[in-house]
Amino acid sequence: HLMSGSLIELAARPADRERLYDQPDAIPGAVEELLRWVTPIQQFARTVTADTEVGAVPVAEGDYLVMLYASGNRDEAAFGPTAGELDLTRAPTTPNLAFGFGEHFCLGAALARMEARILFEELARRRMTFTQAGAATYLPSSLVRGPHEVPFTFS
């Protein structure tokens, strides 16, 4: 869903896409920004294993907590005053939450980053232009946000 979501964003921003093509060294940073922005895994729930507090709110053992990764990836305290905007030149100073964190960090993170990087490097090498050729349909899920189908026209 990272790649299809990223293609949707780049199709809507042809000037950003061209800048990326002109500066292929910026692709790894752009992948991080697109991960932050697209956030395919929107949230995850956990069961609290011991009484604790989260942000001064008491949480009891056995309670469920839902971590909203997409919301965390828009946090102005972490990503600055423009956290609500896609900026392919944003310096990745704060790790995004697209792959989770801690012991539950996604084992496929390096592979997904590599796949996206190679996709954008190849698009840049070939100077591929593309447009979205119709509306995307999305998976009916609160956990995963990703297109089920999205038509593109490449040239």
Where are the language model's segments positioned?
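Cytochrome P450
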Residues: 1-155
